[in-house]
Amino acid sequence: MLTARLSRPLSQLPRKTLNFSDRENGTRGSLLLYSAPFVPVGRRTYAASVDPVGSKAVLITGCDSGFGFSLAKHLHSEGFLVFAGCLMKDKGSDGVKELDSMKSDRLRTVQLNVCKSEEVDKAAEVIRSSLEDPEKGLWGLVNNAGISTFGDVEFTSMETYKEVAEVNLWGTVRVTKAFLPLIRRAKGRVVNISSMMGRMANVARSPYCITKFGVEAFSDCLRYEMHPLGVKVSVVEPGNFIAATSLYGGTERIQAIANKMWEELPEVVRQDYGRKYFDEKVARMESYCTSGSTDTSPVIKAVTHALTATTPYTRYHPMDYYWWLRMQIMTHFPGAISDRIYIH
C-alpha cells in the first residue's frame, strides 16, 4: 500500500482514474489514484542517532569514478580511514591520481579488480596489515563497483550477461566473503549498492536487472545470517544517476556499444526486428542517460547513514519522485495493474 504525507484530507486531493484490464479473467476495472505531496526522496532526512566515527576504517570498491570516488572523499572528510578500491590504480586513472593527490594517511587507494580473486585476497591482506589493530577488524565495506549495458534479450550476447554478472553480482559476493572476517570482528557494516532496477525490471536492461536482483537477494540472506553476530547489512537502491556517474561514458560510448551489438546479431534477429526498431531503442537509452540526476549527494548521504547510524535502515531509496512511485507500484500492485500503466 502506498503511503503519502498528506497536507489535506484524502477526499480533497486531486484524483486520477486509470482504466486497466485483467487479461486472464477478462474483467475490466479502474484504479483510483490520489496525487499527494511527498517529501522528495532524494532530500530525505535520516534519523540523527549515529555512532561516533572515531578511527573507524572502511573499504569502498569502484572508486575510480562515480559514487565510489565521491564517497571516498566524503567519508574521509567525515573522519573515516578510507581504503579506496580502484580498478585502475596500477594504470594511474584520473580518479586515482586525484585521490592520491590528497596525500592523507586516512585515504589510501588500493588496486582492486573485484573479478579477480587474487587481487581481492591481496587487498584483504594489505588492508588487514594496515589497520591499527587488526583484531578489532574493519568497520565498513561498501560494495559499489559495477558496470552496465543495454539491449533487448535477443540483442544481448551470453558473453555480455556473464561479464555484467561477474562484476555486479559475483564481484559483490567475492569481496564480501573476503572481508567478512574483519567485518565480523568489528561488528561492523556491509553496504551494498544495488539499484532501483534491483526491485523492478525494465526493458532493454536485463543483464543489469538480473545482477541487481541478485545483489538484493544476497544482501537479504547475508543480513539474516549476520544479525546474531552483530553485523548490520544495508542496501542502497539509487534511481537514475547515470548522468552523474558517467556509467556509459556518454553518447559516443552508447553508440559504440550499439554498433558492436548490431554487427554481432544473428541475421534472423536483424531481419525480424529491423534497424529502425534497433535505432529507436538506442535513442531511448541515450535520452535516459542524459535525463538523470547530476547530483550524487542523495546516494552519498544514504551510504553515510548506513555506516554511521546506530540503527541503519535495511534499504535506502535515493531517487526522484517519479521512480520512487513507479517502484512502489511495480512491487506492491498486481502485475495486471503495473503492466497496464508502464507496458501496455
UniProtKB/Swiss-Prot annotation:
It is found in: Mitochondrion inner membrane; Mitochondrion matrix. It catalyses: (R)-3-hydroxybutanoate + NAD(+) = acetoacetate + NADH + H(+). InterPro entries: NAD(P)-bd_dom_sf, Sc_DH/Rdtase_CS, SDR_fam. The keyword Metal-binding does not apply. The modification N6-acetyllysine is found at residues 73, 97, 103, 177, 212, 260, 281. GO terms for biological process: steroid metabolic process. Substrate binds at residue 195. The modification Phosphoserine is found at residue 246. NAD(+) binds at residues 59-83. Homotetramer. This is D-beta-hydroxybutyrate dehydrogenase, mitochondrial. It comes from Bos taurus (Bovine).
